């Protein structure tokens, strides 16, 4: 199928997917209507409701496909605009950080890689699954990874505007005391042997900058990398 998203500049993934569905509504809804009408006939005469389920699966699958293509094209456009390379799928086994230790069926998609001021940078979408049956849930995140010189102890900065990362921290981590105005927005976890050094790093000025620029993002410093994660991928937009 032709990728119509390649013809437009995508600023908002959700809006572009919605526009695509509305502009090609016949592809989505005419098969649904046909399957639904056929399903009603089969239910009335044969008592089999399976075809009704198929009609709804068609719509859900079509919407998911359109959204996925919009997300891929957004990342391709972002990569071209910043001289990055669109890689596609990535290897979870190579990743460091507490986020990548939880759940099953882990996957990295729409990976792009590049460099800025000699620092390697990667952006990608990450997902994993927890639970089973009625309790099965897929967790989705947008992730940025930046490499820097030197090594850092494993420090986690948990944004209280996003998901609770405290349950993912290492057994040897300790939550550090910070001023109440900052504690309302963030929680900081560090190895017990690096408590003083970490508090010296996260000064009030640094925490103020985090509130201005990183509210809603979880951060992790591990070895020579900084990870920034956010679970609100449904609002993934291009920002200037």
Where would I find each of the regions flagged by the language model?
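Generic, low-specificity signal for short hydrophobic/alpha-helical stretches with a mild N-terminal bias
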Residues: 57-61, 94, 170, 192
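Charged, compositionally biased non-catalytic regions
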Residues: 54, 60, 65-91
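Membrane-cytosol interface segments
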Residues: 93-96, 101-102
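Alpha-helical transmembrane spans
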Residues: 13-70
């Amino acid at each position: 199928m032709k990728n119509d998203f390649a013809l437009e500049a995508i600023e908002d993934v959700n809006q572009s997917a919605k526009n695509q569905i509305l502009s090609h509504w016949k592809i989505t809804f005419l098969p649904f209507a046909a399957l639904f009408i056929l399903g009603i006939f089969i239910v009335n005469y044969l008592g089999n409701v399976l075809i009704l389920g198929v009609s709804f699966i068609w719509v859900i699958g079509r919407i998911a496909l359109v959204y996925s293509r919009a997300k891929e094209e957004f990342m391709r456009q972002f990569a071209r605009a910043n001289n990055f390379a669109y890689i596609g799928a990535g290897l979870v086994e190579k990743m460091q950080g507490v986020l990548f230790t939880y759940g099953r069926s882990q996957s990295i998609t729409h990976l792009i890689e590049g460099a800025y001021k000699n620092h390697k940078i990667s952006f990608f979408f990450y997902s994993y699954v927890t639970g089973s049956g009625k309790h099965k849930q897929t967790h989705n995140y947008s992730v940025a990874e930046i490499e820097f010189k030197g090594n850092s102890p494993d420090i986690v900065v948990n944004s209280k505007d996003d998901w609770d990362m405290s349950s993912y921290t290492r057994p040897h981590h300790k939550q550090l005391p910070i001023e109440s105005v900052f504690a309302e927005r963030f929680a900081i976890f560090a190895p017990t042997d690096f408590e003083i050094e970490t508090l010296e790093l996260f000064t009030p000025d640094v925490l103020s900058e985090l509130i201005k620029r990183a509210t809603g993002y979880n951060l992790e410093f591990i070895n020579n990398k900084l990870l920034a994660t956010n679970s609100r991928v449904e609002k993934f937009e291009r920002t200037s």
